């Protein structure tokens, strides 16, 4: 078992934290906004660890669902499950254990949060199979990656206001943007094996669609900032996020594989500076109030 542990870590992408960070930033945005910038630190820890566990479980299930496809894709052919280094039942078992541990984390929270976690588990578990049926599975991914948003509001406020769903919509558009960049890397392989992705669905309009999704995401956050009366600290973070999106255009405009992958990875910075702007606003507002 210990000898296989490094393989299990690769299966759940512990060597590639970018996915966990892309889940974490929107969840932190929600926690800070829901609590007016004063989230309880145990709650932050629960959601941060839960995000890591559920992303890891999702990776295991994704590899299980795609095991017959991944061997035909150069980038994924050496994954532990695809290459036969671990067995299919091991991936399912790991996903189940991680999901169970994540559920244990939220047991101290209110009933609504636990009920939403069941929905989140269903969405996360079913996402890997959407690529067979749905022309833009990245939109479904956005729901899966963003379900920490309504859960965060539920945990803090005991209800899920309209603002939480608006933030979830923003996350869907952001996910379509960055995961289309990711899908552009595998475009040729996906055509060959018949998997549906937004990069194929958008076709020659892929770059335009990505930039439109960034515009909608940042437009929604601008509306949130204006509605909630956020100050200059937020707008500085928002402007930095806009700069990141414009930088991504320079990377993806020629549709080359490695620059597209670099744009995908750079979304960590976009999410990070946007959260930094939100957190900084509450920090400045709190200092001014004192």
UniProtKB/Swiss-Prot annotation:
One of its GO terms (biological process) is ubiquinone biosynthetic process. Its main location: membrane. Its cofactor is Mg(2+). CDD domains: PT_UbiA_COQ2 (cd13959). It is found in: Cell inner membrane. GO terms for molecular function: 4-hydroxybenzoate polyprenyltransferase activity. Gene3D superfamilies: UbiA prenyltransferase (1.20.120.1780). One of its GO terms (cellular component) is plasma membrane. Keywords: Cell inner membrane, Cell membrane, Magnesium, Membrane, Transferase, Transmembrane, Transmembrane helix, Ubiquinone biosynthesis. InterPro entries: HB_polyprenyltransferase-like (IPR006370), Prenyltransferase (IPR039653), UbiA_prenyltransferase (IPR000537), UbiA_prenylTrfase_CS (IPR030470), UbiA_sf (IPR044878). The chain crosses the membrane at residues 41-61, 89-109, 133-153, 158-178, 202-224, 269-289. Its EC number is 2.5.1.39. It catalyses: all-trans-octaprenyl diphosphate + 4-hydroxybenzoate = 4-hydroxy-3-(all-trans-octaprenyl)benzoate + diphosphate. It is a multi-pass membrane protein. It comes from the Bacteria. Pathway: Cofactor biosynthesis; ubiquinone biosynthesis. HAMAP family: UbiA. Catalyzes the prenylation of para-hydroxybenzoate (PHB) with an all-trans polyprenyl group. Mediates the second step in the final reaction sequence of ubiquinone-8 (UQ-8) biosynthesis, which is the condensation of the polyisoprenoid side chain with PHB, generating the first membrane-bound Q intermediate 3-octaprenyl-4-hydroxybenzoate. NCBIfam families: ubiA_proteo. Belongs to the UbiA prenyltransferase family. This is 4-hydroxybenzoate octaprenyltransferase. The lineage of its organism: Bacteria, Pseudomonadati, Pseudomonadota, Betaproteobacteria, Burkholderiales.
């Amino acid at each position: 078992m210990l000898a296989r542990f490094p393989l299990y870590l690769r299966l759940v992408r512990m060597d590639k934290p970018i996915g966990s960070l892309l889940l974490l930033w929107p969840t932190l945005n929600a926690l800070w906004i829901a609590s007016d910038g004063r989230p309880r630190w145990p709650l932050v820890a629960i959601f941060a660890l839960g995000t890591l566990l559920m992303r890891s479980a999702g990776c295991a299930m994704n590899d299980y669902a795609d095991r017959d496809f991944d061997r035909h894709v150069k980038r994924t052919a050496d994954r532990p499950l695809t290459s036969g280094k671990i067995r299919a039942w091991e991936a399912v078992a790991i996903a189940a254990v991680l999901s169970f541990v994540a559920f244990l984390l939220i047991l101290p929270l209110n009933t609504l949060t636990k009920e939403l976690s069941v929905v989140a588990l269903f969405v996360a578990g079913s996402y890997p199979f959407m690529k067979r049926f749905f022309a833009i599975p990245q939109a479904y991914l956005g729901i899966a990656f963003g379900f920490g948003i309504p859960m965060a509001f539920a945990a803090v406020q005991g209800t899920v206001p309209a603002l939480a769903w608006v933030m979830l919509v923003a996350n869907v558009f952001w996910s379509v943007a960055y995961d289309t960049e990711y899908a552009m890397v595998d475009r040729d392989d996906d055509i060959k094996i018949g998997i549906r992705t937004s990069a194929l669905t958008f076709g020659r309009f892929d770059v335009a669609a990505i930039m439109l999704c960034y515009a909608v995401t940042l437009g929604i956050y601008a509306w949130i900032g204006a509605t909630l009366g956020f100050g200059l600290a937020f707008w500085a973070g928002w402007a930095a996020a806009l700069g990141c999106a414009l930088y991504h255009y320079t990377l993806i405009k020629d549709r080359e594989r490695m620059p597209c992958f670099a744009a995908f990875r750079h979304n960590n910075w976009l999410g990070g500076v946007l959260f930094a702007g939100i957190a900084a606003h509450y920090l400045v507002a709190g200092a001014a109030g004192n």
